[in-house]
């Protein structure tokens, strides 16, 4: 599979919105990135706060049919984790399904969306947006009301804002998505499961999760199955969780 393009934008409202608008211009795997995103989505309805020049905002477009498209966020979390370890030597943990934590604080957020394109919107693709906190100061997270967020620089990494965004964008596109995509497109999440489980901070901890019919369940997270679902042992048996909010005891202030 060849990479069509990694496109840099000096400024962008939202890299996800840009890729949706230009989806047909990309090959099987292509990407866009910026360090100045002015109209992103704040978590849980919060107002978006831009960190101009101090964070990487990246979206990859995938036109390849996928065996398990719903598990792309899990693959994406591994892709980012690997690139951050290569660049900075940090060992991030994954909060299921796709938040990356460093020293217990969130350093990466991921949002995947389906896309329709082409004649009468009959084409189907998927995009994956990734935000990496590179060098925001503590005051940024205070202003954005993100008490559980942090940046690589705040955690002691040596960040070079003149070169790192391009290095990470190229590395994510080539090594994070393009190279494993043949296996992932054919076989889904299963070949990546062991690596994911080893990095998943949920496993062995008490979690609270949303139930499909409403309400919440609680128990100990014991595994991530081959379909990417979080396996939770509850008082009434095992639950396989795939959607909804999951809180982890001791993470983000959850008790």
PLM features: residue spans?
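N-terminal lobe of the biotin/lipoate ligase/transferase fold
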Residues: 1-90, 106-108, 115-116, 254-255
